[in-house]
A protein has these predicted regions:
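Thiol-based oxidoreductase modules, predominantly thioredoxin-like and allied folds used
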Residues: 7-12, 32, 43-51, 55-72
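Non-catalytic, surface beta->alpha helical segment in thiol-disulfide oxidoreductase systems
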Residues: 82-83, 88-126
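Eukaryotic short linear interaction motifs
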Residues: 38-39, 68-71, 96-97, 113-115
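Mid-chain, well-packed structural core segment of small domains
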Residues: 70-83
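Structured beta-strand/turn binding interfaces of compact recognition modules in eukaryotic regulators
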Residues: 33, 63-66, 90-92, 109
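Local sequence-structure signature of Cys/Sec-based thiol-disulfide redox active-site neighborhoods
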Residues: 16-52
Length: 126
């Protein structure tokens, strides 16, 4: 199996465009973290392992908040992120009138919660 492409840059405009063009079998997963963040480093391998188990129907975006401060700031203003790490997913089968409201999300570094989050995604994405 080839290595899954994980994107490391995203803007609000690109996200809005992606959300408009997702088909019912697709989803976008966004992970916010930072190299200096201990909890982010704690879940890094768990996230990478889970990313690799999905088909290309799941678009994975792993954002360092220092390199993607603009979109991180947009989420902070909308009170969708109050700290990192934060993972959120948007399913193509759902309408996304408000780009900043994900269909599901998880915060923190608890491995069980992170794995449960990925298991919920598996119910929607093959």
């Amino acid at each position: 199996m080839s290595k899954k492409t994980v994107f490391t840059e995203l803007s609000k405009e690109i996200l809005e465009n992606l959300l408009k063009n997702l088909n019912e079998e697709q989803a976008i997963l966004i992970k916010f973290g930072a190299t200096w963040c201990g909890p982010c480093q704690k879940i890094k391998s768990v996230c990478e392992q889970n990313f690799s188990t999905f088909s290309d129907n799941l678009i994975c975006v792993d954002l360092d908040v220092d390199d993607n401060f603009e979109i991180y700031g947009h989420y902070k203003v909308k009170k969708q992120i109050n700290g990192i790490p934060k993972l959120m997913v948007y399913y193509g089968k759902n309408s996304h009138e408000k780009w900043f409201l994900p269909d599901d999300s998880v915060s923190g570094s608890d491995h069980n919660e992170i794995n449960n989050f990925f298991n919920r995604i598996r119910k929607h994405i093959k």
